[in-house]
């Protein structure tokens, strides 16, 4: 992956964040000139002024432990928000799923609950609530590599995806993108290739795209909540599942499913969303500081993800995990052809824009 300087990355992310902020405040999110101007003039003064504003505590939900890529990303966001607001906005990060599964949290905040203010979710999690653009980020083999994803996340197209919930009348808005590495399957029994997946019971989260992908591999999609996955693997309810490498290790899945096949079927794209109720608690100065922190966090995540993933993979290999490389992904892509076609045909032009952003 081509390395991007943090300064350049923040500049690009700032444009995306500014475009989002303009749209959230009623301005046009389509004006490049307006977005650039906002990025260059909004943050510094407003963020400094935020220190004298009324104190607000916002609860941030994270389903994974703090030592994962997404957990560290949440911690960084907390630090930056509190730094840029002089402590007038405090982020209370609740990790390891203590507030419930991703779906539990979304159901709560979209149902009007005010006990959770910000949630880190899978980038496609809002698909179940009508956000069809986000679904495209979960299509198998869309992103060739990390640089491909970050080309999208720092483009003028990204705010269009992040703003979709607002356009649909949902009481949340996206504030930044991130990723936790490519997702790979892991199994209880050894596998050597795609042929070994036939008949396996693979855990899914009841997402239509994931269901179709698993069926395309000849396996049986089996719905199990993330919190119950460890015991489901241990007791034979499922034969395998899929996660990014860091989450696989941090959640102790190698203890019960020690075979990791590096198929990289999708990139684990994530986003953070803030509720309208929480956003409206903030002054304009605090909102500007939160968006500056969001842009910085997006850059932090890009710096962290690949390095952290490679470190974890080395640790897994050293500890005896059976790591299986997949040098030829063509059979996997062919197996997913149907689910790709079925889930992109209604947004073919937009999906092609994503594909064309490859590095």
Please identify what each model-predicted range represents.
Residues 2-4, 12-15, 26-38, 48-147, ...:
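N-terminal secretory/targeting leader peptides
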Residues 148-159:
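A gly/proline- and charged-residue-enriched helix-loop-helix capping module
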